[in-house]
Amino acid sequence: MHDAVTRPTPPSDATAWPRRQTHAVQIGGVTVGGGKPVVVQSMTNTDTSDVASSVKQVAELWRAGSEMVRLTVNTVEAAAAIPRIVDKLAMMGIDVPLIGDFHYNGHQLLTAEPACAEALAKYRINPGNVGFGKKKDLQFAQLIEFAIRYNKPVRIGANWGSLDQALAAKLMDENNLREQPWDAGRVLREALIRSALDSAEQAVELGLPRDRIVLSAKVSGVQELIAVYRDLAQRSDFALHLGLTEAGIGSKGIVASSAALGVLLQEGIGDTIRISLTPEPGQSRTQEVIVAQELLQTTGQRAFTPLVTACPGCGRTTSEFFQELAKVVQNHVREKMPLWKIHHPGAENMTLAVMGCIVNGPGESRHANIGISLPGTGETPAAPVFVDGEKKVTLRGDNIAQEFVALIDDYVEHTYVRSAG
């Protein structure tokens, strides 16, 4: 692999790099870039023209914590549905910015359904398929004109699965003339970056302000994505949307996305993220939101809900109870967090530990705000609980889970100041 840019020097301490400075882009009521916290977004997989199903899924994603939601707009029926979806969400008290995902025919759809152009909070434009040949510039310009008319931001989202083939061929020809030609992978990365940057500059020339442009350049390989975004970050001051495209299903998708985005976020690159998971059969679409939040929280970018530290278990642990307790605790704090966020701000930063034996249990529990060390093999059947580093109580018997959860609730009630109202 060839990095196109020099990597920044890491800080000498354990902190991440400072956030990259970008234009601040207002998307509905959410600000992306400009030093604001990294924003979590998601995407529906419903038929957008099915208003009821789309509203239901947007609401689920919003309740899970998605701060922006993207929907496919691929037909006139889908475009016509967008204002109705916005209205129904508003009736439910849900004010989440909706992003229209356009490919091939966006200019035609917005011309046919201008109410869609007005209702959306942002447009996503793919420079690789917005048009071909002589029609490309015209059709791109039509979409930008809608954005200007309705005061909407756009994301210019290049993707190596739909790369501008004319640009790629041009750069391949130029590469053949180099004294030391780049490898094909580097040329394709450059084509992806140039596609995004050139389109952004074209939008600016058409009259779209820089603070209404977000860029992305997605690939499905971890190392390629890191190289692309390092380069893109050094060559522009546009806000950047991060995502590993087609990340995959299950643990593979989670690990690949986290490996790529974690590196970039630690280097201060990225203003909004999406985890592009393929849902497993029967799995909720909200999984991608939870993974995005946990990635941001574990890398120290933001705090959404208390996370539970728990040991994996070994031959010293006597049962699966500590694993079950860890799950109970994590589910409990997730369920409580919407109310805690209102009445007990700061509770999202609380740290919890559920440990399974004496080896690391007491030590890890002391590091947490509240921790419990359950007995392992051959240990006294008692579970000491530590609060802010000090042993507070020892739990015994059949109600340890309920008693520990009650201690957590009591801690939140008395530690995090209740807001008025």
Curated annotation (Swiss-Prot):
Pathway: Isoprenoid biosynthesis; isopentenyl diphosphate biosynthesis via DXP pathway; isopentenyl diphosphate from 1-deoxy-D-xylulose 5-phosphate: step 5/6. Its cofactor is [4Fe-4S] cluster. InterPro entries: Dihydropteroate_synth-like_sf, IspG_bac, IspG_bac-typ, NO2/SO3_Rdtase_4Fe4S_sf. It catalyses: (2E)-4-hydroxy-3-methylbut-2-enyl diphosphate + oxidized [flavodoxin] + H2O + 2 H(+) = 2-C-methyl-D-erythritol 2,4-cyclic diphosphate + reduced [flavodoxin]. Converts 2C-methyl-D-erythritol 2,4-cyclodiphosphate (ME-2,4cPP) into 1-hydroxy-2-methyl-2-(E)-butenyl 4-diphosphate. This is 4-hydroxy-3-methylbut-2-en-1-yl diphosphate synthase (flavodoxin). GO terms for molecular function: 4 iron, 4 sulfur cluster binding; 4-hydroxy-3-methylbut-2-en-1-yl diphosphate synthase activity (ferredoxin); 4-hydroxy-3-methylbut-2-enyl-diphosphate synthase activity (flavodoxin); iron ion binding. It is an enzyme of class 1 (oxidoreductase). Belongs to the IspG family. [4Fe-4S] cluster binds at C311, C314, C357, E364. Binds 1 [4Fe-4S] cluster. The gene is ispG. Its EC number is 1.17.7.3. Keywords: 4Fe-4S, Iron, Iron-sulfur, Isoprene biosynthesis, Metal-binding, Oxidoreductase. Pfam families: GcpE (PF04551). One of its GO terms (biological process) is terpenoid biosynthetic process.
